[in-house]
Design a protein with these regions (language model features):
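Glycine- and small/polar-enriched repetitive beta-structure motifs of secreted/surface proteins
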Residues: 1-548
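C-terminal intramolecular chaperone/autoprocessing and neck/assembly modules of extracellular spikes
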Residues: 1-16, 524-626, 635, 639-645
Length: 645
């Protein structure tokens, strides 16, 4: 029937369970349609068999024929839909061009307005997905979101102007006002945050989370930016990671394969490549340098152009600008370095104050802590070389070794406390715990062994053995080899002690030589060599004399043999064979003397006086001329007697 010119149809024979109110109520055949509700001018005008549809508004679902389960609320909502099913359109012109597309939702003025056959799209907001035609499985929430999309599928846009310019790109996610707003064909991007990736056009595979993250990116691909303004200036660079507030914020179009994690990390990077910055402000000032690794708050913060550096720890390599190939691991390690290169620092405060010194290695807490400009030092151990400032080419291994050295160079110290007190002394060698530990300014000492030259303060000494020259303080040019050799000497000089506990006759002796374990010297300018009874004793520039004191001898018997033996000895002239001519002995047996020599043959002497012939380690037989001397004495006595008779 009609009420005031408005037609009302319900429960018609073939229009079961339906209600239609319109001034043009259902001119179609209404064949077998059921459970439909239509209110508005020309609603269901062409409906034939479609069921479960709801159309509210001027020309809502006006050309629907067989489509079912559609809901259209608003003027011209789903206006062109004919066979599409399960669509929901709320708002003027929402889904107005849809013909056969199904399972679409358009809420808002012009939402998904031009969609024709697209399916499973969700558009919520004025003009959301406005130009979409065949794109499928898109979600657009917010005014003008994905407004330009035509065929792009599997996109998600939430926020005003999100993915606004997208046309054909797929698999993008944009959440936040203007996020990915300029994107046209870039795909597989994720942008979350206001203006995140706002300028992106064709860049793909990017992730931007945070306000203005990757804001300027246009074609850069495979970037990850997480944090407000992270990588905000990046345009075309790819394969970078920036995580944290302002991470990689100024990188433009040159840097690739950078990783920045932490607020302001790699903040000023422009064209530097292959950098890793982890921590607050790590490598914040870097611009063009590449292949750096900075881990820790403020690590390599001031670096601009220095490449191939590794810094790990709070403020490690903090002030470095152009220095390259440095390694700093530990809190404030190498933190003062500026332009120096090829340094290695491992440990808290290692090489802390180094500025321009190069090729230094410091391993241990406070190792080379005070070094500034010195080069080529090696310090291994806590506080090793910790006071060094300008001394170069030192090697210090052991806790507190060369701890006080400042300007001394070319020293070697191995062992805890070795050369501990050295300040300016140079060219010293100390191997062993506390070796040369009291040396301050003197040079050219060599101490090998625990406690060797423990209190020495003068130079040009050599001590090899535990506690060798242990008490020597002002002595110089001394040599001691053996455990506790020269251990009683304090101020003597030019002494030589060889053998375990070989010592001088007094603490201040000079020019004394003692060779033999447990021997005590004979005084200034003497030499004492041999076993406990002594073998030789020489004084001043005199010839060697044999120790012959009756008080140290026993079993004394006469030996009157002389002339008979001496007469049998043949004195020969000869030459020594060359190395190539010696065949029966090793080449080590050669004696490098040229010309005619005078002497005896050991094998001939052995037949006469076997006791004076000894076999050396090389197999060569040698003659001891001292014993022959005593036979000569007897021979002279015999001749004298014969002459007198």
């Amino acid at each position: 029937g009609t009420i005031n010119g408005v037609g009302i149809k319900y429960n018609i024979t073939d229009f079961v369970g339906s209600l239609l109110i319109s001034n043009d109520a259902g001119t179609g055949t209404l064949d077998a349609a059921s459970a439909n509700t239509g209110i508005g001018h020309e609603v269901f005008d062409d409906l034939t068999t479609g069921d479960d549809n709801t159309g509210l508004g001027y020309q809502a679902l006006t050309v629907l024929t067989t489509g079912s389960s559609n809901t259209a609320v608003g003027s011209a909502a789903l206006d062109a839909n004919t066979t599409g099913d399960s669509n929901t359109a709320v708002g003027r012109c929402a889904l107005s061009a849809n013909t056969s597309g199904a399972n679409n939702i358009g809420i808002g003025f012009g939402a998904a307005k031009t969609t024709t056959t697209g399916i499973a799209n969700v558009a919520v907001g004025g003009n959301a997905l406005k130009l979409n035609e065949t794109g499928c499985y898109n979600i657009a929430i917010g005014k003008d979101t994905m407004e330009a999309n035509t065929t792009g599928c599997y996109n998600v846009a939430v926020g005003y102007l999100a993915l606004d310019a997208n046309t054909t790109a797929h698999n993008n996610t944009a959440v936040g006002d203007a996020s990915l707003s300029a994107n046209t064909t870039g795909y597989i991007n994720v942008a979350i945050g206001k203006s995140a990736m706002a300028a992106n056009t064709t860049g793909q595979g990017n992730v931007a989370i945070g306000g203005n993250a990757l804001d300027a990116n246009t074609t850069g691909a495979a970037n990850v930016a997480i944090g407000c303004s992270a990588m905000s200036a990046n345009t075309t660079c790819g394969y970078n990671v920036g995580i944290g507030f302002c991470a990689l914020t100024t990188q433009v179009d040159g840097g690739v394969n950078n990783t920045a994690v932490g607020s302001c990390s790699l903040k000023l990077n422009s064209t530097g490549d292959l950098n890793v910055g982890l921590g607050y402000a790590a490598m914040e000032a870097n611009t063009t340098a590449g292949a750096n690794v900075a881990v820790g708050a403020y690590a390599s913060r001031c670096n601009t152009e220095g490449g191939d550096n590794v810094s790990m720890g709070y403020a490690a390599l903090y002030t470095n600008t152009t220095g390259g190939k440095n390694t700093a691991i530990g809190c404030v390690a190498l933190c003062s370095n500026t332009t120096a290169s090829n340094n290695s620092a491992f440990g808290v405060q290692a090489l802390k104050t180094n500025t321009t010194g190069t090729t230094n290695t410091a391993v241990g807490s406070c190792a080379l802590d005070a070094n500034q400009t010195a080069d080529s030092n090696t310090a291994v151990g806590s506080s090793a070389l910790s006071s060094n400032t300008t001394g170069s080419s030192n090697t210090s291994i052991g806790a507190f070794s060369m701890n006080d050295s400042t300007t001394g160079s070319n020293n070697l110290a191995v062992g805890r406390g070795a050369l501990d007190a050295n300040t300016t002394g140079a060219e010293n060698t100390a191997l062993g715990m506390n070796a040369l530990s009291a040396n301050i300014t003197t040079s050219c000492n060599t101490a090998i062994g625990k406690g060797a030259m423990l209190v020495a303060v003068n130079g040009d000494n050599t001590a090899v053995g535990v506690n060798a020259l242990v008490a020597s303080n002002s002595g110089y040019t001394n040599t001691a080899v053996g455990q506790r050799a020269g251990c009683t000497t304090t101020s003597g000089y030019a002494n030589t002690y060889i053998g375990r506990t070989a010592i001088g006759s007094a603490a201040d002796n000079n020019d004394e030589v003692v060779v033999g374990a447990g021997l005590t010297g004979k005084g200034d300018q003497t030499a004492f060599i041999g076993g406990s009874s002594g073998a030789y004793n020489a004084e001043n520039n005199a010839a060697w004399t044999t120790t012959s004191d009756r008080r140290i001898k026993k079993n004394i018997v006469d030996n009157n043999i002389g002339l008979e033996k001496i007469n049998k000895i043949k004195v020969r002239n000869f030459e020594y064979k060359t190395k190539d001519e010696i065949t029966e002995l090793s080449a080590d047996s050669v004696i490098n003397k040229k010309g005619i020599q005078l002497g005896v043959i050991a094998q001939e002497i052995e037949e006469i006086l076997p006791e004076v012939v000894k076999v050396q380690s090389t197999g060569v037989k040698a003659v001891n001329p001292d014993n022959i001397t005593w036979y000569l004495v007897n021979a002279i006595k015999e001749l004298k007697k014969e002459i007198e008779e």
